[in-house]
């Protein structure tokens, strides 16, 4: 029986970008058309990747804006982040840049495990942010970029699988930097 590894992931983004819908679709396998603003919810799910099992603890946050102060609970003990914007809102994309900077400053690390998600891809006729813009931003951070649709269950599983992989990648890269070589 494989060892179950605990991973805490915080989902951040501007309001009404679909953070709750992504988490709910991933954990419950369903999409809710109704919208109640989130204060803060948590979800848990066991995810198997290869031979490894992960207890994924998701923190679904209330919408942030560029002036939001991120509480320490969004930084301390957190392994990775899913930063979500809506492809139908340029403002939500701009807020994501500010949130990433706050995370980066809060962690004091050069690398923070992040998956950048352009959600609501099913609403392409209303698109304000092109996929190439999201990809370029993610590349500048050294992060992964994905577009999704919580409504159509497009890549919801892949987002959270990818954040687990990003956490491992960043943890392994720090481990390599700290190795001592005796000669």
Swiss-Prot record:
Maturation-removed propeptide residues: 181-183
The record ties this protein, via InterPro entries, to:
P-loop_NTPase, Small_GTP-bd, Small_GTPase, Small_GTPase_Ras-type
Q: Gene name?
A: RHEBL1
Keyword line: Cytoplasm, GTP-binding, Hydrolase, Lipoprotein, Magnesium, Membrane, Metal-binding, Methylation, Nucleotide-binding, Prenylation
- The identity of this protein, by name, is GTPase RhebL1
GO MF annotations, alphabetized: GDP binding; GTP binding; GTPase activity; metal ion binding
Q: Which interval of the chain is the signal sequence?
A: none
Q: What class of enzyme is it?
A: hydrolase
Phenotype for residue 54 to A: Partially deficient in guanine nucleotide binding
What do we know about how this protein assembles, alone or with others? Interacts with MTOR.
Modification sites for Cysteine methyl ester: 180
Record's PROSITE patterns?
RAS (PS51421)
Q: Which organism is it from?
A: Homo sapiens (Human)
Job description of the protein: Binds GTP and exhibits intrinsic GTPase activity. May activate NF-kappa-B-mediated gene transcription. Promotes signal transduction through MTOR, activates RPS6KB1, and is a downstream target of the small GTPase-activating proteins TSC1 and TSC2.
User: What EC number(s) does this enzyme carry?
Assistant: 3.6.5.-
Disulfide linkage:
none
Q: Give the motif span (Effector region).
A: 35-43
One GO cellular component term noted in the UniProt record for this chain: cytoplasm
Q: Cellular location of this protein?
A: Endomembrane system; Cytoplasm
**Does rRNA-binding show up as a keyword for this record?**
no
Its BP terms in the Gene Ontology are: positive regulation of NF-kappaB transcription factor activity; small GTPase-mediated signal transduction; TOR signaling
List positions binding Mg(2+).
Answer: 38
So where does GTP get bound? Answer: 16-21, 32-38, 63, 119-122, 149-150
